[in-house]
């Protein structure tokens, strides 16, 4: 997009502050009518069949002189054709490049005013009046920064049906691949951190297909065509998606967080795998790292709650597998996974006893299951799939497994032990790793032994009714039967 630079001869009157104007109250009919007259007069094209910068600044000034309620009333009185005319002119270079759109700072001031004043219905009307993708996103950023939570959630709900239309835009050389509405929604979702009610309302308005499209757009994939022919290149900037994940991490709702974690993980996997011979891509590593870091923070906010919700709602574990595979490739990634395993074993507060938690039954649907065992099975299955994806070989895998599980050979539960920190006997730990490294056991057998508490005899993993729940969690991800 090309924005017309300001000429030194052009009127550069400073816009009134968006917070100036009459005190809020009932809209004044006379001020609304006067502003409408000004706007319609300034949009009336003159001799050069164009609207000048001065005209557009007069419109801004007219809006700045109103209360929020009056601005909303003014916009509601403008027809769709009038809104289309106004938005077309905001970035119009005019006759011979002498007319005029507003510069980026002036547009930002306008979107600050509109975002903080209009209701969701009028904001959607202005948004849909734009043909220009960049200005759509600028307006959405104004909504994200300045609208009330009710307006933000209404705006998201209004755009939700449009997020799957795949209307990526661009020119011959550079094309934005994601849906504009999806990116707009991603920006607004990222502004809802700390507002549990707004997060719940916003995510409830998006089905999984729509949210996936929003998160895909939030990676800001851009295609660059090659004038000499051959394969195009791609770039990514996942800031909007990462911000949405960070905001979701502040919700107390484990199911909401699990949904965000799962769908963000799928997009991270797509970004991480995008750089290939046929699809050369720039910034995939940084973008994947940014998404992964957000997912880590979200997961750490309630490891047990999120994993339980994932096991119930996303049994294939695609998001968790992608997260763990990306984490294994990070410096210190094994340490991160170790901390997550410890919380799953001993509770989010690290004060529990792994064996007691693992074997604690819960009644459900007339039967009994073991939630801690099922969570550990699900996580362990995803960890196995992540190791398979990284594909480093037995020797290197053993060293990583030592880093992740070595701490679990601490104090084991038993009579008189009130501060047990471990769940693996040295014998079980050493046997699991040595048999895998020597080829006597498969990787999955080693991981199962390391994520199951040592039995009462101290020589072999636990064998009891909780195994059924562990196996269900494991097999839902790996499809590898343990019986």
What are these regions (language model features)?
Residues 1-11:
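N-terminal acidic, proline/glycine-rich, low-complexity intrinsically disordered segments
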Residues 11, 15-483:
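Non-catalytic all-alpha helical scaffold/repeat segments
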């Amino acid at each position: 997009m090309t924005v017309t630079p300001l000429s030194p001869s052009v009127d550069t009157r400073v816009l009134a502050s968006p917070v100036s104007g009459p005190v809020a109250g009932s809209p004044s009919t006379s001020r609304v009518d006067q502003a409408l007259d000004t706007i319609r007069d300034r949009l009336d094209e003159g001799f050069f069949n164009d609207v000048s910068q001065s005209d557009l600044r007069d419109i801004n000034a007219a809006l700045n002189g109103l209360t929020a309620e009056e601005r909303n009333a003014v916009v509601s009185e403008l027809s769709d054709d009038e809104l289309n005319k106004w938005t077309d002119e905001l970035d119009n270079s005019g006759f011979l490049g002498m007319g005029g759109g507003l510069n980026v700072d002036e547009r930002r001031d306008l979107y600050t005013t509109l975002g903080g004043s209009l209701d969701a219905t009028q904001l959607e009307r202005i948004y849909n009046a734009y043909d220009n993708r960049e200005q759509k996103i600028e307006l959405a950023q104004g909504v994200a920064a300045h609208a009330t939570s009710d307006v933000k959630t209404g705006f998201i709900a209004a755009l939700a049906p449009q997020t799957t239309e795949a209307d990526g835009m661009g020119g011959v050389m550079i094309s934005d691949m994601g849906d504009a509405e999806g990116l707009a929604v991603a920006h607004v979702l990222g502004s809802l951190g700390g507002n549990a009610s707004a997060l719940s309302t916003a995510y409830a308005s998006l089905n999984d297909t729509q949210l996936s499209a929003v998160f895909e757009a939030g990676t800001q994939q851009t295609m660059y065509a090659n004038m000499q022919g051959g394969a195009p290149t791609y770039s990514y900037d996942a800031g909007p998606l990462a911000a949405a994940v960070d905001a979701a991490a502040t919700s107390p709702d484990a199911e909401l967080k699990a949904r965000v974690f799962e769908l963000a993980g799928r997009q991270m996997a797509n970004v991480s795998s995008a750089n290939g011979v046929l699809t050369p891509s720039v910034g995939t590593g940084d973008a994947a790292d940014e998404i992964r870091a957000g997912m880590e923070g979200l997961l750490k906010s309630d490891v047990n709650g999120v994993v339980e919700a994932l096991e119930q709602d996303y049994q294939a574990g695609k998001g968790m597998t992608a997260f763990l595979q990306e984490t294994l490739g990070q410096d210190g990634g094994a340490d991160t996974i170790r901390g997550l395993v410890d919380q799953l074993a001993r509770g989010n507060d690290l004060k529990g006893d792994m064996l007691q938690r693992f074997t604690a039954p819960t009644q459900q649907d007339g039967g009994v299951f073991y939630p801690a065992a099922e969570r550990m099975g699900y996580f362990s299955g995803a960890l196995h799939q992540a190791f398979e994806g990284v594909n480093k070989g037995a020797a290197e895998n053993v060293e990583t497994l030592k880093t992740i599980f070595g701490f679990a050979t601490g104090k084991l539960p038993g009579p008189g032990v009130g501060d047990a920190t471990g769940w693996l006997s040295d014998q079980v730990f050493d046997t699991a790793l040595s048999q895998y490294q020597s080829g006597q056991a498969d990787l999955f057998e080693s991981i199962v032994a390391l994520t199951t508490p040592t039995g009462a005899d101290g020589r072999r993993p636990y064998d009891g009714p909780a195994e059924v729940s562990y196996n269900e969690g494991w097999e839902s991800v790996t499809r590898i039967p343990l019986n």
